[in-house]
């Protein structure tokens, strides 16, 4: 009897062990190699803000982790942790994330060499390691990144020869290697935009246009949404002894089937969201109207940041905390279809410069056109000139130079060139460092793809419109130069263009008033009273001279924006001023400067720049005085 009990207990023990073995083997999964690679990356980085806090090495699913983006097939396609104060080194294990399309680790303190393993990522399209402390050479095998489109390694300490293999990447459209210690020569690139400024060993023997630094870009903003996680805790099934081996196996199989079914349903929901919101055009993201409607609280009036001739701008906030500015374009019924709209957007997106507002994405439908931009925390120059505390003189000078560089890029370095058509303080935005960022460029064409026989109104802002544009409808780079001159006067005086002269009960044209004070050497009467005595009188006088040069009556007499940049930086102003001062036209503008004739044949005299006639006009109101065809470059 005792022997039988012992035999029974041994058999039962064996069955119990088999039960747990089968249960564990069926319900467990092999370690995900992507998890292993990501944990290695985490372990080599110092994370002061805890952004990798939920990266669990025992997890089987990294798609629930922050800073990770996954495809509908549950594969890691994006790694992005910009501006998180990360330090340490970048692990070579990143090369095991073979499905990566985007790596965005800019604005950190990561040091060491760029791991050569990163060049083994066959699907990588975007690599941004800018503004870190990487050193050593750029891996020579970088040409293996055959799908790479966007590469930023600027502002590091990289050295060694300029990697000629970069020219072998067929789809590369943007390259920024500025401010490193690379040495030449520089080969020809398929990239439409590239920058090598700030590399002394290259630039001292290179052409000026290669090292002008005019193509430095705003950081690419990559949206990496965290996917919903799958259930990672497997219920430890402790089966009662009395149920036996067969019941244990059945329960285990049932549990695994249910878990996999739930995972598939979750992945379907994630896939639906990605296909709605991530249909991008190059580096642009295509948003759904529903996403932007939710982000802006239904485009509520409380979310409005500003209003202009092209439409309202709303503050938007996505679920991941990203804050953006959403411009809802008006008058879209007459615009062209999505194809032409997206083509124009692609051209705007190629205009990449630190002093140009970067386009993040768009929404295009039969009834809506929306553009999504980064949110500028310091607002516009127009709003800051009225805010407290007042902008100091050095900041105003910095704004003037930054805005000039942005327009210089649009006019002379962008291909095709872009004419802004509405240069004013409200369209010059300020980032967190009070760097000037030119906004609203290229929008005139987005809203004017009508048939050739259809006319459109002159677009601009009262007080900023050049006389030739108002009278003929023909715009050029010199139209923008005129508007920039008015902007300089606003920076000096702290007033809007229509307020010039009102402060001293001046009833004449405002430019004549400014010229009169300058000629009488009464510059201090022009300076914003909020500055007190904390400004450099010589610098104010020089900026005033540049403003007067920019606002000359004849477009041919105005300088190009490249010349404006040089003069603001202290080069060539005296010579240009002396030459212009000799022309009789400078102080005696033609009366047609202030008189225009309407298209119906009736003479209507309007003091374009005086205090009378526009006292009740709003500075943001677009002027639609005449219907006439616009032509010329973009």
UniProtKB/Swiss-Prot annotation:
Reactions the enzyme catalyzes: L-seryl-[protein] + ATP = O-phospho-L-seryl-[protein] + ADP + H(+); L-threonyl-[protein] + ATP = O-phospho-L-threonyl-[protein] + ADP + H(+)
Segments traversing the membrane: 237-257
Molecular function terms from GO: ATP binding; coreceptor activity; protein serine kinase activity; protein serine/threonine kinase activity
Modified residues (Phosphoserine): 380, 383, 471, 476
LRR repeats: 99-121, 123-145, 147-167, 171-193
Signal peptide stretch: 1-27
CC terms in the record's Gene Ontology section: membrane
Broad class of where this protein is predominantly found: membrane
Protein kinase domain ranges (all copies): 299-554
Entry's localization field: Membrane
PTM-bearing positions, type Phosphothreonine: 296, 322, 395, 455-456, 461, 472, 551
Entry EC no(s): 2.7.11.1
GO biological process per UniProt: anther development; cellular response to peptide; homeostasis of number of meristem cells
Cytoplasmic membrane side: 258-634
Keyword Transport annotated: no
Superkingdom, natural source: Eukaryota
Matches recorded under SUPFAM superfamilies: L domain-like (SSF52058), Protein kinase-like (PK-like) (SSF56112)
Matches recorded under InterPro entries: Kinase-like_dom_sf, Leu-rich_rpt, LRR_dom_sf, LRR_N_plant-typ, LRR_R13L4/SHOC2-like, Prot_kinase_dom, Protein_kinase_ATP_BS, Ser-Thr/Tyr_kinase_cat_dom
Sites of Phosphotyrosine modification: 469
Key words, A-Z: ATP-binding, Glycoprotein, Kinase, Leucine-rich repeat, Membrane, Nucleotide-binding, Phosphoprotein, Receptor, Repeat, Serine/threonine-protein kinase, Signal, Transferase, Transmembrane, Transmembrane helix
Protein name: Probable LRR receptor-like serine/threonine-protein kinase At2g23950
Organism: Arabidopsis thaliana
